[in-house]
Regions:
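Histidine-/acidic-rich catalytic cores in large beta-rich domains
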Residues: 3-14, 38-53, 57-63, 91-92, ...
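Proline/serine/threonine-rich low-complexity linkers at boundaries of modular beta-sandwich domains
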Residues: 14-35
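Surface-exposed loop/edge segments in extracytoplasmic proteins
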Residues: 72-83, 118-120, 176-178
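A short, sequence-level motif marking secondary-structure junctions
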Residues: 82-84, 127-128
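Surface-exposed, short loops/turns at beta-strand junctions within beta-sandwich domains
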Residues: 96-104
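Aromatic sugar-binding surface patches on proteins
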Residues: 85-93
């Protein structure tokens, strides 16, 4: 079951919204959260609309790799939390980004030990709602290059003359992978500093977001 936090305010860039998310997660993590029964929460901090928060404790140190598949969308895969054979852990707390909006997504997380031996697979399916605010890609045109296209998970921002001032994410198939809401003012860039994202969310305000979307 994927849980949803009922926030008392809609503005994600307030300490109240962020504290509510942390409070709920802290409470829910107190249960026995194993790889067979992980905690799954939809976009707890409100910053990546189609993301899923994952929390579980394993019986031995492991690292995790994920794959997201959805009909008509590009398959997205990666290693969670910068994990590797040198970064195994017992406590697994991740934000899985980039599920395809309005489509049934199957998320598969594979866990490995420091010797790169497979130990466990966790799999679940969910259909994130389609956001009206997300601009549609009307046409996808194949280019002439014979070079293989790299894994696509792109951010689009910097609208000068548009009310659609959020940060939007797409894959190589032009399928929406969610959005990061902004407060009515476009951002020009996303900086990565010490593993955090830094971007403007209002005309005179910056957000610093960690790997959990907080």
């Amino acid at each position: 079951k994927i849980l949803t936090i009922k926030h008392s305010t809609k503005n994600v860039y307030t300490s109240k919204y962020q504290r509510e998310a942390t409070s709920y997660l802290t409470k829910w993590k107190k249960g026995k959260r194993t790889l067979d029964a992980p905690l799954l929460v939809k976009n707890p901090y409100g910053t990546l609309s189609t993301s899923i928060y994952f929390y579980a404790v394993s019986t031995e140190p492991l690292y995790a790799k994920y794959t997201i598949t959805a009909k008509g969308a590009e398959t997205i895969s990666g290693t969670l939390a910068g994990g590797s054979e040198a970064n195994v852990r017992l406590t697994h707390e991740y934000l899985i980004p980039g599920l395809a909006a309005g489509r049934k997504n199957t998320v598969e997380i594979n866990f490995y030990n420091a010797a790169n031996e497979w130990k466990k697979t966790v799999r679940f399916s969910t259909t994130p709602k389609k956001e009206k605010a997300i601009p549609k890609i009307k046409k996808v045109k194949n280019g002439k290059s014979k070079t293989a296209v790299s894994l696509g998970f792109y951010a689009m921002f910097g609208h000068d003359k548009s009310d659609a001032t959020n940060i939007y994410y797409y894959d190589n198939n032009g399928v929406s992978r969610g959005l990061t809401p902004l407060n009515g003012y476009r951002t020009d860039r996303i900086l990565t500093v010490d593993g955090n994202w830094i971007f403007s969310y209002d005309i005179d305000k910056l957000a610093v977001m960690n790997r959990l979307g907080h």
